[in-house]
Amino acid sequence: MFEHDQKIVQQLLSENPDFKLLYVKHQELNDKVDKAGSGVLPLDDVTLENMKKERLLLMDKMALLIHKHRREGA
């Protein structure tokens, strides 16, 4: 996730509590989706799809914060 922006991600994780909250929640959802996909965590299809959509929304929000940080730093 955001491989080309790792330096900015690390900076935001240490300096921006909103970004950190989004990042942690994304990681938690990612783990649950992975477990559901491998059959370890039984979820119905609707719940799994909703989790995937929420995960994408979190990524979009983090991307906006990264873009804003990059723009302000330039």
Model-derived features: positions:
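Extended, charge-rich alpha-helical interface modules
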Residues: 1-74
